[in-house]
């Protein structure tokens, strides 16, 4: 029998709370999504005035980071520069995205989920997501 680690709702809630607190301090509204080990949505938040377009983007960033087992900006780097990787259609999944801001959460050497942020620059999204993912990995 195979077993695997996945983040749970309390992990997801802790990550969301951290992201929302930091974004509030910056006075920058964001959308945040946390996915389980399968890439499926576990928790989600959209701050007031966060762009509606960021809803799907945040969810897709969490999906991509889980399924690709790497930060979404790395997926983007590979598809923007064919010499480093391949076209996004290679993944065969329209939910895959290469915008920064999705970060996998690792437990016991395997991806246990992902945290994603959308609504700011890719760099700011990635920074917030990485800090929240670290809270889950290192409670």
Language-model region placement:
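Flexible, solvent-exposed loop/hinge segments and secondary-structure transition points
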Residues: 1-139
């Amino acid at each position: 029998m195979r077993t695997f680690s996945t983040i749970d709702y309390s992990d997801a809630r802790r990550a969301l709370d951290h992201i929302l607190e930091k974004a509030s301090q910056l006075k920058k509204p964001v959308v945040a999504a946390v996915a389980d080990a399968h890439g499926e949505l576990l928790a989600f938040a959209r701050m007031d005035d966060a762009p509606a377009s960021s809803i799907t983007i945040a969810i897709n960033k969490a999906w991509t980071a889980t399924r690709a087992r790497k930060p979404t900006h790395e997926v983007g780097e590979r598809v923007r520069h064919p010499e480093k990787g391949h076209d996004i259609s290679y993944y065969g999944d329209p939910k895959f995205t290469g915008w920064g801001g999705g970060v996998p959460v690792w437990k016991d050497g395997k991806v246990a989920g992902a945290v994603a942020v959308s609504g700011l620059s890719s760099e700011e999204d990635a920074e917030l997501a990485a800090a929240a993912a670290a809270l889950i990995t290192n409670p």
